Amino acid sequence: MPSQRSSLMQPIPEETRKTPSAAAEDTRWSRPECQAWTGILLLGTCLLYCARVTMPVCTVAMSQDFGWNKKEAGIVLSSFFWGYCLTQVVGGHLGDRIGGEKVILLSASAWGFITVTTPLLAHLGSGHLAFLTFSRILTGLLQGVYFPALTSLLSQKVQESERAFTYSTVGAGSQVGTLVTGGVGSVLLDQCGWQSVFYFSGGLTLLWAYYVYRYLLNEKDLVLALGFLAQGLPVTKPSKVPWRQLFRKASVWAAICSQLCSACSFFILLSWLPTFFKETFPNSKGWVFNVVPWMLAIPASLFSGFISDRLISQGYRVITVRKFMQVMGLGLSSIFALCLGHTTSFLKAMIFASASIGFQTFNHSGISVNIQDLAPSCAGFLFGVANTAGALAGVVGVCLSGYLIETTGSWTCVFHLVAIISNLGLGTFLVFGKAQRVDLVPTHEDL
């Protein structure tokens, strides 16, 4: 691996022109910079999920206000993924070209504004279902670029030996955001109505975006990137990434399949768990089931990153560690999801839900980092392809779950669906997954 990296970092001929932002992308963060950006991106991921989870948390109250049935609620919940799946590849490509941090800032500013204005859209007229579906599609479009841009950013700025912990730390923001919206959002929901939850999550996102713009990004680089986007010009010289070679590799398709399955199973649980607890245990407190599983998932995510990097530093093969993380993230989590569908005890349901969500965070140190192992020069683009597949599966999975609940009246089939999807992804990755780079060509240039 060191020899491969050194061959990639040979001086580029002077005739190859690069913009200042592209030149900056060729350098790694120093340790203080890495720590600062890790904290900022952790908060950014937290706010991403605050906005994303707002609708699932408010679905029951909004269904009562607007008279939705399960199928209509499923349409609104799944519409997020209709937009989410369309911008994954674009987000990864833009991250590789203009810098992931700039893509993240621009998208956060936009989705924060949409989230704040969602309650206004709901009361524009009698077509509330159409307006809210439209706002969720827009939110999905804007959030779809986040993780591919993040993957591109970390693959360029973070040392390989530190990627798992950095990514799992930033990824823990998904649990923190769900926790914040589940806890604070539940209180706001009870005290101030569902509209206040949207104002809360959207407002915090706009404050975060202002801070990043004001204190962390170079204004000239941001203006330059916007100019390139407006003119449709490439920020860097086109690279010779062997796309045909890339997509002929079984390891690439194994990574895509595993990411698809992990994303789909996670999206189903994320969208329907609040409704499951509300209907199955109507006397339980909303803040309990909206908080506890995600609270326990935070240390689980951090632990997975720590143990992953530790095992690699002790000499274990990279692919062995990645597959072990997927056994935990897809295999073990699916067992607890199955148990969740066969209990009538609130306490046991909380334990099973917490375990299932907690073990799913091990995917951050498994398949999410494996994509960076395979193709660090175009990790954003490749992750975008994989996450597009996951988002498309999420649309089908969330809609299908709503249909199954409505027609069968049972939640058991939903958790069986989660287990089937998870184990399909696990089996594919165990058989075909690898960690060797597949993006190398004789004259390779970083994107």
Swiss-Prot record:
GO terms for biological process: ADP transport; ATP export; ATP transport; guanine nucleotide transmembrane transport; lysosomal protein catabolic process; purine nucleotide import into lysosome. It catalyses: ATP(in) = ATP(out); ADP(in) = ADP(out); GTP(in) = GTP(out). Activity is chloride-dependent. One of its GO terms (molecular function) is ADP transmembrane transporter activity. It comes from the Eukaryota. GO terms for cellular component: chromaffin granule membrane; lysosomal membrane; mucin granule; secretory granule; transport vesicle membrane. In brain, specifically expressed in the medulla and is associated with chromaffin granules (at protein level). Predominantly expressed in adrenal gland, brain and thyroid. The chain crosses the membrane at residues 40-60, 74-94, 103-123, 129-149, 169-189, 192-212, 252-272, 287-307, 327-347, 380-400, 413-433. InterPro entries: MFS, MFS_dom, MFS_Na/Anion_cotransporter, MFS_trans_sf, SLC17A9-like, Sugar_transporter_CS. It is a multi-pass membrane protein. PROSITE patterns: MFS, SUGAR_TRANSPORT_2. Keywords: Cytoplasmic vesicle, Lysosome, Membrane, Transmembrane, Transmembrane helix, Transport. It is found in: Cytoplasmic vesicle, Secretory vesicle, Chromaffin granule membrane; Cytoplasmic vesicle, Secretory vesicle membrane; Lysosome membrane. Its main location: membrane. Residues 1-26 are annotated as: Disordered. Belongs to the major facilitator superfamily. Sodium/anion cotransporter family. Voltage-gated ATP nucleotide uniporter that can also transport the purine nucleotides ADP and GTP. Uses the membrane potential as the driving force to control ATP accumulation in lysosomes and secretory vesicles. By controlling ATP storage in lysosomes, regulates ATP-dependent proteins of these organelles. Also indirectly regulates the exocytosis of ATP through its import into lysosomes in astrocytes and secretory vesicles such as adrenal chromaffin granules, mucin granules and synaptic vesicles. PANTHER family: SOLUTE CARRIER FAMILY 17, VOLTAGE-GATED PURINE NUCLEOTIDE UNIPORTER SLC17A9. This is Voltage-gated purine nucleotide uniporter SLC17A9. It comes from Mus musculus.
